Swiss-Prot record:
This is Holo-[acyl-carrier-protein] synthase. It comes from Sinorhizobium fredii (strain NBRC 101917 / NGR234). InterPro entries: 4-PPantetheinyl_Trfase_dom (IPR008278), 4-PPantetheinyl_Trfase_dom_sf (IPR037143), ACPS (IPR002582), Ppantetheine-prot_Trfase_dom (IPR004568). Mg(2+) binds at residues 8, 57. Its cofactor is Mg(2+). Its main location: cytoplasm. GO terms for biological process: fatty acid biosynthetic process. Belongs to the P-Pant transferase superfamily. AcpS family. SUPFAM superfamilies: 4'-phosphopantetheinyl transferase. NCBIfam families: acpS (TIGR00516), pantethn_trn (TIGR00556). One of its GO terms (molecular function) is magnesium ion binding. Pfam families: ACPS (PF01648).
Length: 139
């Protein structure tokens, strides 16, 4: 069952301006080490950061908190699954909020799609609660 949906649309030029104006202070405040390494290696660095920024905003909306109630920028990070598909890795307050949302006997699956077409970057997040299969041999 779907327990959270969030979306965000951002102007890449806004992130370009923040990168120029605040540099590493902005990057280190908002992004995880994995996101920084990936984005800094990209040809279009600002677009890469913008997609990740939009993903964090969308995820915070799907969590129902926005960037409040103990959910911070670096609690949410875009990571890639082995096949390359992006997803969100949650820690800290974001992970705690996700656990609060889950019905008993369920685990979370976070679905993420990110895209950019200058001057815009966009992200959608769907949080799904999936039933946990009972362990074999239990009654």
């Amino acid at each position: 069952m779907i327990i959270g949906i969030g979306s965000d649309l951002i102007d890449i030029r806004r992130i370009e301006n923040s990168l120029q104006r605040f540099g590493e202070r902005f990057v280190n405040r908002c992004f995880t080490d994995i996101e920084i390494a990936k984005s800094d290696a990209r040809k279009n660095r600002a677009a890469s950061y913008a997609k990740r920024f939009a993903a964090k905003e969308a995820c915070s909306k799907a969590l129902g908190t926005g960037l409040a109630q103990g959910v911070f920028w670096k609690d949410m990070g875009v990571v890639n699954m082995p096949g390359g598909k992006p997803t969100m890795q949650l820690t800290g307050g974001a992970a705690a909020r996700l656990q609060e949302m889950l019905p008993v006997g369920h685990r979370a699956a976070i679905h993420l799609t990110i895209t950019d077409d200058f001057p815009l970057a966009q992200a959608f997040v769907i949080i799904e609660a999936l039933p946990v299969a009972p362990a074999e041999g239990t009654v």
